[in-house]
Swiss-Prot record:
Region: Disordered, residue numbers: 233-263
Disulfide bonds: 592-612
Lineage of the species this protein comes from: Eukaryota, Metazoa, Ecdysozoa, Nematoda, Chromadorea
Keyword vocabulary terms for this entry: Disulfide bond, Lectin, Repeat, Secreted, Signal
Signal peptide residue numbers: 1-21
Protein name: C-type lectin protein 160
SUPFAM superfamilies found in the cross-reference section: C-type lectin-like, vWA-like
Location(s), subcellular: Secreted
Molecular function, one GO term: carbohydrate binding
């Protein structure tokens, strides 16, 4: 697939054939759109600018650009301390290259001071005014979308007259405020204001993209009416919108669409008050190998989206080996052959990695000479690379694939199984078009549990991938068993004590057993039937009948005389779950609690009251997992 893949999303986004107040929902959509990218020091860092560009990529990468339809002009404000604004694009492939040049300028030259007034004056001189270099088409609705982080109220207020003139000339201006509130812009003039908070910039919700599209671009200007619905003809090689035929009907006419493939179905996460693994991307301590499909099936637009996603992910991590918790990253590209692009040892700075991600000629375009792929070969290289990385550090292979072949020597299933059996995780992202539903299930076969994802080319999966990487980064100290429920890892680890002792003695033993980690170990907290079953099975698996008569274990529950309540050692008093044996609790037998195996069963345990001082047994200790909050040295 070529750059023409960019056109598909907007065809569905902008061209439904329902009669409404949005002309873009009728074929054909015609707009002249100007988008301003803020590259000033108000954006704070080049990482934020890169994320801003990712948002614009997500907004525009599938638009159908054509002189008779949508034209798009991109303005770079203060990149390299200057303004960059060329004529309207009618070729989608040039859009991403232009955005890429802005991204690189921010990384290479740094950020420069700027103001909102100068940005507006540039628009007036270059695009809007009577002497503009690049004027609009006649009888076409005109839109300006300004991404801005400027916050000087006097500076902003000084643009009111100019922006009012824009409106009088037919330009509707939408302001996308990054890290600033609409109140700062109350003294200027605009059609729509959309806010993106700094913390949202790395993974902007689709609802924000939809708002910009629908209320900033696709609405109808006053005096414009919905034109007659037309047939948009298409051939297999055109970049036009999909064919939509209007039929006589008394109801609403709907467009002919191709259903999207069903994404991999992950069961909902278990319901319960379990300790999640902490997930601070900057504090990850893992090794990552990205494996990227650059075959014709990916298309240039797809490759740029993959790079944007990798940029966003790695840009939030630390690659500095001087920092205790840091990441090593490698990258392999493949089509019918594979090639190592970045070796893990080459980068100690995330900015250097992301800059090379956009400048390395090996990642500038897809391989249009072939639509064949050999993921098996790429995974062989990935296995060798990841095996040579840091010892004792958790590792993951992240596969981005737009095509897949599971036949003959190209079958990647066995090598993927070998990677997983070596203790490494595999994340798959099926980067698909609507007709590629078979790819979803097939590429997902290679993934670790709950780590197969699907991108429909109209959204980044940053949140999902961050969570998956944090799952890789979540594990237990040596000898401890992690809580895993329905293939979801949690930040809870368990360890059985090895000698018989009273409940009170065991209570003090747990912190000692965890002293090499957090030192906050305690007798186990049982708060669901699902967790109870997990713990019973774990204890039975580690029960030594020769040294312990029965597989009973102390839990962290005891009666508090002062409050006259049962309290867990972690302070919980309102645990909704209980598992008392018949006739219990029974204070006459004691104030502490042991989980005892029911007679005639192997895995059925019930809670029994015991004497805290005289009844002896083993305990089951609980401790926090190693994750982005709690560091564990390499094993």
């Amino acid at each position: 697939m070529s750059v023409q893949a960019w056109t598909i999303f907007l065809a569905f986004l902008l061209f439904p054939v329902a009669v409404c107040g949005y002309e873009c929902y009728v074929t054909p959509c015609t707009r002249d759109v100007i988008i301003v990218v803020d590259g000033s020091s108000s954006m704070q860092t080049s990482t934020y600018i890169s994320q801003e560009i990712n948002v614009i990529t997500k907004l525009t990468y599938s638009w159908t650009l054509d002189y008779s339809k949508v034209r798009l002009a991109l303005v770079g404000a203060y990149f390299g301390n200057e303004f960059n604004g060329l004529d309207y694009f009618t070729d989608s492939s040039l859009v991403e290259k232009r955005l890429q040049s802005f991204r690189l300028a921010a990384m290479q030259y740094g950020l420069f001071n700027g103001d909102f007034n100068t940005t507006v004056r540039f628009l007036d001189e270059r695009y809007v005014g009577q002497r503009a270099n690049f004027g609009p088409r006649t009888n076409v609705q005109k839109r300006i979308v300004i991404f801005t982080s400027h916050s000087g109220e006097k500076d902003i207020a000084s643009t009111k007259n100019t922006l009012q003139k824009f409106g009088q000339l037919g330009y509707s201006v939408t302001l996308v405020g990054i890290g600033v509130s609409e109140d700062v812009y109350k003294n200027t003039y605009y059609h729509k204001f959309v806010t993106i908070q700094w913390f949202e910039l790395g993974s902007v919700a689709q609802s924000i993209i939809d708002t910009i599209t629908e209320e900033g671009i696709c609405f109808l200007d006053q005096g414009w009416t919905t034109p007659k619905q037309e047939i948009c003809t298409t051939t297999p090689t055109t970049t036009r919108a999909p064919t939509t035929t209007t039929k006589k009907s008394t109801g609403t006419v709907k467009p002919a669409t191709t259903p999207k493939p069903v994404p991999p179905t992950h069961a909902p996460f278990p319901v319960g008050d379990y300790q999640d693994c902490s997930c601070t991307t900057q504090s990850l301590y893992i090794d990552i190998v990205f494996v990227v499909d650059v075959s014709e099936g990916m298309g240039l637009g797809g490759l740029m989206m993959v790079k944007a996603e990798i940029n966003t992910l790695v840009g939030q991590m630390s690659l500095d080996p001087e920092i205790q918790k840091h990441v090593q990253v490698g990258l392999i590209k493949y089509s019918n052959e594979s090639e190592i692009v970045f070796k893990p040892s080459e980068y100690t700075n995330e900015d250097e990695f992301t800059e090379d991600l956009w400048t390395d000629p090996r990642l500038e375009d897809v391989d249009e000479k072939t639509d064949e792929v050999n993921l098996h070969l790429a995974l062989q290289q990935a296995a060798k690379m990841i095996g040579s990385m840091r010892k004792g550090v958790k590792k993951v292979v992240v596969i981005y694939a737009a095509s897949y072949n599971d036949e003959g020597d190209d079958d990647a299933r066995q090598i993927a199984a070998n990677i997983r059996e070596s203790g490494y995780e595999i994340i798959t992202v099926a980067f698909v078009e609507p007709e590629s539903s078979s790819l979803v299930m097939k590429i997902g076969e290679l993934a670790s549990p709950r780590m197969n994802f699907t991108s429909f080319r109209d959204e980044l999966l940053v949140d999902e991938l961050e969570d998956a990487l944090c799952q890789v980064n979540c594990y237990c100290p040596n000898g401890w068993k992690q809580l895993v429920l329905e293939d979801r890892k949690y930040g809870e680890c368990f360890f059985p004590t090895k000698i018989d002792a009273s409940w009170t003695a065991t209570k003090f033993e747990c912190p000692i057993l965890s002293k090499e980690h957090t030192g906050n170990g305690h007798l186990v907290y049982v708060n669901s039937a699902l967790k109870n079953t997990f713990l019973n099975k774990f204890y039975m698996d580690h029960w030594d009948p020769e040294n312990q008569e029965k597989p009973n274990y102390d839990i962290g529950l005891s009666y508090d005389k002062a409050t006259q309540k049962y309290i867990w050692v972690n302070g919980v008093t309102n645990n909704p779950y209980s598992n008392w044996a018949e006739g219990h609790p029974n204070l006459s037998k004691g104030e502490c609690v042991m989980s005892k195996q029911e007679a005639g069963t192997t895995t059925d345990f019930k809670w029994n009251s015991i004497n805290c001082q005289t009844d002896s047994g083993r305990g089951l200790c609980q401790e926090a997992a190693c994750d982005s909050d709690f560091y564990c040295p390499p094993n």
